[in-house]
Every structure is written in structure tokens, then in C-alpha cells.
């Protein structure tokens, strides 16, 4: 690990240890070490499409995809009492599988393993409602309901996949929570996202306008590079575990490094 990267890890850990309302924001880049492709990386879905190439192959069968050290690092930050809220653009369910609490998570594009009720907005796993995709399909909003398909256990409303497809409305509750916590944040940590998709790309701007420090951890450029207080271009799995370990050391020592306090 280079001296520069060590300094960046130390700086990020100092700000996180001193923070009162840390918000993390994750994109597809956090899941590449689990075997999923990203979108705008060197071998990403959109990068290959723009070059006239076929989509990238998944590194593992879907049934073998598991949370990686980066997902578990965010769980540790939450359990330390530092990470107050997590915003994610991902639908891969890896944050929940890693043990991150649902009530502190806004999945802006839904979750491929969860269904939700159109009437009361309750969310369920496929198993909780007995949704068999071989019988009922994916359950997207645009699909015609089938006779006898499972209904919401709470209100008997229609349940659909929580995944947001093109043309679907974004989940209002999650969007509202994401903006609220972005505005409250004193450190906004964007991880593995190119920050170009709206309205998610407005959240770091809201955080900056509210006085938060912006940390970017991403391979490749983002529209916020010049505005970030700290930009780390390195592997996510290489950076997050030592950041968390350093945060633990700082919290254990009761130390907030000089100049790393809230502002």
C-alpha cells in the first residue's frame, strides 16, 4: 500500500471517527468483488455497450454471489454507532445479506429479493409471501396480475417486485429518507458510484450544500471530483477494512485527530 493511500485512509478514518451523522452511498462498484459487474468501470456494462461489446460475464453463478469485505465493513461502521444511514443504488440484496439493518437503508432502485405491496408499501422476502418465480414470474409492475398469485399479508393488496424498472416511479419513502439524511450528514461517503444517475447524484450535492465533507472512493471519474474533500481511487475492498480498523482505534482511544472534527 502506497504512502499516499495510507494518508488517505488515515484522513477518512479521522473524519468518520469524529462524525455525528455519517451517511454512506453505494453504487455497483461495491459489489464487483462479489462477482457482479459494475456499469461504468473499465469493463462495466455501459462501458462495453458503448464500445459495441457484449455485456460482461458474471464472475460467479448468481446462487454463489455473497457479500464481500466492503459490505461487512459498512455493517461494522453501523454497529460502532458511526454510520447513521446507507443509501444504495444496488438491487443485489448484498447489504441486507451482510446484516445491515433495513430501517437504516434506502435502496433507491429496489431489491431483487424483496416484494412490496402497492397499497400499503410493506416489504417482504419471496419466502414470506410464498412467491415462486417459476409460477408467478418476476412480478414486475408492468406484468398482468395472475389469478391466485400471492397478496399482501397485511392488507391483501397487490404485491410486486420492489425492483424499479425503466419507466417505474422511484420509491417515494426511500427517496425522501435519502435526501433527509443527506441534508443532515456531516460526512458523506460515496463508494463505488460514478454519481451520474438522477436523482441519486443530487444527494452528494445536498450534503455539500449542508456543510458535509465529501469522501469519494471510486475507480474512475465522477462529476464531484473537484468538489470532494477527499478522493480515493483504489480498490474498495483494499480501502474500507483498514478505514474501519483505524476508526476502531480512534474510538477506542477516545481520540479525535487534530482538524478532523465536525464543522
What are these regions (language model features)?
Residues 1-263:
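Conserved catalytic core of sirtuin-type NAD+-dependent deacylases
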